[in-house]
Amino acid sequence: MNEVLAKGKKAKEIARELVLKSTEQKNEALSAIADQLILETAYILEENKKDIEEGKAKGFSDSLLDRLMLNEQRIVDMTEGIKQLIELRDPVGDCVSAWERPNGLSIQEMRVPLGVVGMIYEARPNVTVDAATICLKTGNAVILRGSSSAIHSNKAIVAVIHRALKQTSLPQESVQLIEDTTRDSAKQLFTMNDYLDVLIPRGGKQLIDTVVREASVPVLETGAGNCHVFIDETADKQMAFDIIINAKTQRPSVCNAIETIVLHEKWAEQYGSELFSSLKKRGVELRGDQKALAMDSSIVLASEEDWGTEFLSLTLAVKLVSSIEEAIHHINTYGSMHSEAIISENEENVSKFFVSVDAAALYHNASTRFTDGYEFGFGAEIGISTQKLHVRGPMGLPALTSIKYVIRGNGQIRK
């Protein structure tokens, strides 16, 4: 039996054990993982350095290297996320609803673990910690399959997690890493219906599209983040500047950074040139339509492809519109249903934007950078879903549960 099948079979066995573990036991395991990550920070960073050096040798972009890179602060941030997770209510065993039928049957809708979660992801080794801990909290076994670019980091983190779990009542194999990073291992994971209950892809558009297209296992789709901010005619200048600069430049390589600004022409007439200048001073390359070029000749003419691109870098598309309806049409045409924002003092337009724009998270007068499990108060997230079935938006603890119905009677038979 090869690695993928062997780990799938083991995960199925472990899932039956995990469903019996108490919240206290699961939290003890999470606490042990947080402590072990701090204890072995030097080891993790040493292994991460190998990935960074190999990435540089292969010519990885700065944005990809940033997603790949770990440092002491990022490891501390991981452990803080775990501590938040410990404090969160365990949804497993919760009674979602309960009712009694006229025949005396008592019916309860209960939350239960999904079972075995498969996670396939690119570059970011912090996902290894997020996925492992949120799955453990919800009583799920997890099979991790990262990319070759982060293999040293992922192997180190999982080894640390195993050493932590060895000190607890949870089996070490609750968290397993597929070390084979070839396409064959990924394709096998896609079709492992006998062992996987759900597969979650987390990465770029190409990875996600491949998983959605080829997997026979149920998929929780975490979409790419082609996010927009629409600056309405009534938008406050300073607020607009602050939000745009934050949403684009704070960390351009993440999925909740913006890729296009949509400007109302009347607002742009007053403040557009100054906004463009402010962005360029921060190293942002602007790609705009003809109206934007007429305001600033240094802007590169945007191609049709640019409007639908998740740049994940300091590149920003600029679209000028004459109405909110035109803005909404552009966003719904090119957006990825992730996070979209409007900056406006016109409540009617805000309401229209909220009703008409199709996305997991909609913002009024705030940065899209808040679409995140930590910022929503969920603790560590396993991804941001852009699909509509099962769950949408940042996927916290309830997203990794299903339901079962528990029916109690006193001898009823159906007539």
Swiss-Prot record:
Keywords: Amino-acid biosynthesis, Cytoplasm, NADP, Oxidoreductase, Proline biosynthesis. GO terms for molecular function: glutamate-5-semialdehyde dehydrogenase activity; NADP binding. Coiled coil: none annotated. One of its GO terms (cellular component) is cytoplasm. It catalyses: L-glutamate 5-semialdehyde + phosphate + NADP(+) = L-glutamyl 5-phosphate + NADPH + H(+). It is an enzyme of class 1 (oxidoreductase). Gene3D superfamilies: Aldehyde Dehydrogenase, Chain A, domain 1, Aldehyde Dehydrogenase, Chain A, domain 2. It comes from the Bacteria. The keyword Manganese does not apply. Its main location: cytoplasm. Belongs to the gamma-glutamyl phosphate reductase family. HAMAP family: ProA. This is Gamma-glutamyl phosphate reductase. The gene is proA.
